[in-house]
Structure formats: structure tokens, C-alpha cells
Amino acid sequence: MIITAIVNQKGGVGKTTTAIQLAAALANRGMSVLAVDMDPQANLTGTLVPAGAAGEGALTVYEVLADGSDPRAAVVPSAHPHAGVLDVLPASLFHKSLSVLDAAIGNNPDRYHRLSGALRRFEGVYDHVVIDTPPARDTLAYNALTAADGVVIPCEPSLYSADGIAPLKDSIDQTKAYTNPRVEIVGLLMTNYEHGTIVSKRMRSAVRDMAECLGTRVFDTPISHTTAVRKSQAAHTDIFTFDAKCSAARDYDAFCGQFLECVGGDGDGR
């Protein structure tokens, strides 16, 4: 079971979109995938989970982390069929929000290990776990980094997209030093990319420089800017279910292939 966190401590760079599409792309390749929503906005849950499945009274990742509830009882299947399995460990906006988790956990010595402990219950069940994270350096983010084998960093072709990279490197370095020495940066993924524009070309060069500083790679396929992604979110579905022939779907599928070349886990490592 390979655990990957989608992380950037700047908001609006495509973290949740990348988590959704990577999880769906892996499931489309016949693998068993668990998507974990660690973002208080719960947008991954709203996209992949059937309406009401994570509503009032339902177990969510909050109860798993704060109360020690069995994570297997909180998992719900995706609302849309795939060739493999796509399940979700959901967040919720309807009752106990992840935004108050810091207060619930306090300074417990295991506060950064709650998610990794919960995910151990799924060994032998899933090929991949994909974690969506908040744009913050908080207990949620450190739980994700402590649980992860690898990190994918989405970044948009803008002057401000790189703002979250330096603090993220510090967070990863601290995680490696204190809670999870195995975590590595798998690569940087360019999102919302407008081919042929001067800004995108300049930022692609800048992202390559960032990757070199981080000791990692830039994935070969940037994710094209397209309205189909926003439309798929409005339809509460992944891009492959919404329009498998659009440029973003092709790009995310190509990225998934490159991701698997980096991490393995093609379905035989369960």
C-alpha cells in the first residue's frame, strides 16, 4: 500500500483537484484506492461521496483522528463506478469540522501519528491511499506528512504559486527529522497550464529550478487549463466520469502513468 499526500501550503493551486483526479485515474487502471479528505473545506468529499453519505451523524475522518473511531466504519464508496475500487474516508462540514481538530487533540504526544495509525488498518486492502491536505502548517498537514510515503506538489504557472514551496520544504524536513524519515517528494505537477503563453513558459522554467532545489523532478505532463475541470466539480464527479476525452482527463491520465513509474504500486503491492 503506497500512501501519497497532495501538498502545497499555498491555497488555490489545485491540491484537491489533483487528489481527486489521481485517485480516480488509479482506480480507472483497476487498482484499489482510498482517498482521504484532510481538508476542512471537504471539497474532495463533496465531489466523490454520494449526497448525504457524510452528513449529520455519519462517521468521518474527524471521529477517526479525534476519538479513535474505527476508520473502516467511516469509509464510503465513491458515487461513481470505476474499473477498480475508489473509496473515500470523508470529511464533513455538517457537524464536527476538521478545523477544530487542533483543539480536540491538544498536545497529545501522538497528535501527528493519528492518521498513520488509522491507515495501518487498511494494509492489504488498498493498493494506494491518496490524501488531500489543507493549505496550512497545522496538525492536519503534519498528520498527512507523517503518514505518507511520498508527496506530490501541485503548482500553478503564476508568480505567487511558488510562495508555499519554501515553508513546505521546511515542513517536510521537520517531518523527516522527527516523525517520518521515509517521506520523499515524488515530484512537482504543473496545473492550470496554458500552453504557449509567455507566463507559463517562464514559470515552467522556474518550477524546474524549484524541483532542482528540492532534489526532485517535474512531471513531464502539465495539466492543461480547461473549463471542464470546474464543470466536473459542479457536477460532483471526477474529470474522467465527466468527460474522459477532454485535455485535462488526458493530462491527468498521463500524469498518473508517470506517477506510477516513480512509485510503483501497479496493483501487485497490496
Task: For the regions a language model picked out, list residue spans one by one.
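P-loop NTP-binding core
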Residues: 1-270
